[in-house]
Amino acid sequence: EKNVLFAGRKSGHVYALDPDKQGELLWVKRIGKGGFAGGVHWGMTTDNKNLFAAIADTNFINKFPGEPTPGIYSLDGLTGKLNWKFTPQDRCAENEKPACDVGISAALTATNDLIIGGGFDGWLYVLNKDSGKLLWEYNTNVDFSELAGIQAHGGSIESDGAVISGNNLLINSGYLYGGRLGGNVLLNFEVD
C-alpha cells in the first residue's frame, strides 16, 4: 500500500505527492477553472483509495475565463483518473444570483459508503461513494424553528463540512462572507 499526500488549489488543480520521496509529484489534474472564487476551497477527503474533491467554480465576480465546472469529483488516488463527477442542479432564482450559486466549497465528508457535501446555494448532498449517484438532498436555505422557539434561517453551506457522530449528521448553514447567502443554523439529521 502506497502513501499519497493530496493537495488542492483555488486554481482548480489537485495534486498527488509521494511523502516517502520528499513530496515527489505523482500526478496533477485540473478539474476546475479556478480563480478568486473557484477551484478547491476548504478541503478534500479520501477513502484511502480515491480522492474526493469539491469544486466551487462560481461566477460570483466573472473575472476569470473558461467554463465553470462546479461539483464533486472522485479521482483514483494513484493515477488521477476521473471515476465520476456530480454536477448540482441550478435552482437559484435570477434575483438571488450571484450570492446563490451551485458551487461546492465546503469541505467534503466521507463515510464507508457515502460522500457528503454542501453548496453555496444551501443544498446538502449525500452521494454514493462508489458511483456518485445522488441518494439524498436537502435545502437548508429556508426558515427553521429553533428548539428555543426562535425563527432562524439557513443559507450557504461553506467552510466546514458535515460531521458524523453516531447516528447524527451535523451541518452548519449560513455564510455571509464574500456576499454569500447569510443565515446561521446548525442542523442535526438522524442517519439510519
Task: Please give the residue ranges for each predicted region.
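Extracytoplasmic/lumenal domain signature
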Residues: 1-104, 109-159, 163-192
